[in-house]
Amino acid sequence: MKEFDTIAAIATALGEGGIAIIRVSGNKALEIVNKIFRGINGKDLLDIKPYTMRYGHMIDENNEIIDEVIVSFMKGPRSFTAEDTVEINCHGGIVATNKVLQNVIKAGARLAEPGEFTKRAFLNGRIDLSQAEAVMDIITAKTELSMKSAMTQSQGRLSTEINNLRKEALDILALIEYAVDFTEDDEEPDETIPVKVKEDVITLRGKVNNLIDTADEGKLIRDGLSMVIVGKPNVGKSSLLNALLNENRAIVTDIAGTTRDVIEEYINLDGIPVRLVDTAGIRETEDVVEKIGVEKSKEKINEADLVILMLDTSRELDEEDKEIIDYIKDRKYIVLLNKVDLDRKLSSEIVDNLENKIELSAKTGFGIDDLKSKIKDLFFNGSIDAESVMVTNTRHKEALYRASENLDGALNGLNNNEFLDLVSIYVTSALRALGEITGAELEEDLVNKIFAEFCCGK
């Protein structure tokens, strides 16, 4: 375990609440907190047993009571950071919590940097980097499904998979080294070794690519699906948004162009976090405010994972509808034929040629379940398993791509009968790329950058 100074930070969300927790970690954690703790009957903290709690008060330099607290003690390495850790349970609230923290710092602790507690857990070998990143994913999870996926990663399932792949890469390198040593000793080379190396590289590349194939689904589970609702004004976009949200979030009127700006909301679609974007229409307009909304709509369409095109079945297709269809036709889309509860007037060969059509009444809710099923079919083949090993982090995906590309390079070298020691350069690069995922191979600056994105107190 590495030697660090003692750090402290508020571990709970800042604001009014029943209880707040101040976390203190480091070799002097107990000694520092003891300086400002007064237990019942004069008891201090120096004789506290690990994994127990003690009731008392926090006091300032004038021996005045700051707050009533319960203090717990976790002895390293059996703690989150693998260091001695003290947690002060005090009353919630900005003033009370900050007052306790200020006195902990006065007593000798340093204010922790964002993510520094988790960083210490990583540097002390308690967790690897992918597990550390999963901690933040647990905190930011928007649905139970994304929570389960993050929990699976935090328990080391992905780490185990990556470590197994690294072992296979090391075995390939050992085989290459064995063959190269034979050549250097002027012994007759074993002609079966290049064949075995090639087979192993192909197998390893296949496993790496299988993980890459999970990345798109994994990213959607972690970050959510970006879905844009688009259509001409008053086609029912806001009504659809409200139907999906089960509340009147958007203004619904008979006046075209009422939604003048982009409206964004999150919904839980059977465990998938979906960021719904209700846009202004994209018609030509002279209204300056509406024109800004139209430009924002086009930006959101270009950024979206899925476009929901709404058409009004109670009206004929017009030029504005055709303009929208032309704009979104090369993207992944679903066509909602809205207002089927009214007399149908929509009839067009253009519409007939569109894919993924669903009849809907946003007003009555008819067709909403069909829409949800279609979304799952398009992105998850109809089923989702958050407990299987999958790649949810873009950094991990990029590292896997580099590993796969280097294994491609190794395979090309083998096919061209290049020297095995040249092939080993590609395999070594693949090994390092895989190591970046768990932190086994990573520059210190990048490690610092990753943990800097964490919240304080974690």
Swiss-Prot record:
One of its GO terms (molecular function) is GTP binding. Residues 224-380 form the TrmE-type G domain. It is found in: Cytoplasm. InterPro entries: G_TrmE, GTP-bd, GTP-bd_TrmE_N, GTPase_MnmE, MnmE_dom2, MnmE_helical, P-loop_NTPase, Small_GTP-bd. Its EC number is 3.6.-.-. Keywords: Cytoplasm, GTP-binding, Hydrolase, Magnesium, Metal-binding, Nucleotide-binding, Potassium, tRNA processing. Binds 1 potassium ion per subunit. Its cofactor is K(+). Mg(2+) binds at S238, T259. GO terms for cellular component: cytosol. (6S)-5-formyl-5,6,7,8-tetrahydrofolate binds at R23, E87, R126, K458. The keyword Transport does not apply. GTP binds at residues 234-239, 253-259, 278-281. K(+) binds at N234, T253, I255, T258. GO terms for biological process: tRNA methylation; tRNA wobble uridine modification. Belongs to the TRAFAC class TrmE-Era-EngA-EngB-Septin-like GTPase superfamily. TrmE GTPase family. PANTHER family: TRNA MODIFICATION GTPASE GTPBP3 (PTHR42714), TRNA MODIFICATION GTPASE GTPBP3, MITOCHONDRIAL (PTHR42714:SF2). NCBIfam families: mnmE_trmE_thdF (TIGR00450), PRK05291.1-3 (NF003661), small_GTP (TIGR00231). Homodimer. Heterotetramer of two MnmE and two MnmG subunits. Exhibits a very high intrinsic GTPase hydrolysis rate. Involved in the addition of a carboxymethylaminomethyl (cmnm) group at the wobble position (U34) of certain tRNAs, forming tRNA-cmnm(5)s(2)U34. HAMAP family: GTPase_MnmE. This is tRNA modification GTPase MnmE.
